[in-house]
Design a protein with these regions (language model features):
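Short E/K-rich amphipathic alpha-helical oligomerization segments
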Residues: 29-55
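Amphipathic alpha-helical coiled-coil segments
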Residues: 10, 14-24, 28-31, 61-64, ...
Length: 92
């Protein structure tokens, strides 16, 4: 069943996802620029003693790295739900 409230809620969730994805991408890019490498390279460099980084900074970097695909997947699911809702609403 389609209602404006459902569509508004899905649109709101889509906007949240987009905002979080952009912020996360920006943080990942800033860290990559700061350290001159991406997370997998940084982890390797740390294990080899070629990188000094605070434990919390590395944990935050890893959290963002792992969260990004989850947010992207969530965004796709919301977009699909909204598209399905609009298709089913157009049948009535």
């Amino acid at each position: 069943m389609h209602t404006d409230e459902y569509e508004i809620s899905l649109a709101r969730e889509i906007n949240v996802c987009i905002r979080v994805i952009k912020q996360t991408q920006m943080k990942l890019a800033q860290r990559q620029q700061l350290f001159g490498m991406d997370l997998p390279q940084a982890s390797k460099a740390l294990n080899e003693g070629r990188l000094v980084i605070e434990r919390q900074e590395l944990a935050d970097w890893r959290d963002d790295f792992e969260a990004l695909p989850q947010w992207e997947q969530r965004l796709e699911q919301y977009r699909e739900a909204l598209a399905t809702m609009r298709i089913s609403a157009s049948r009535f």
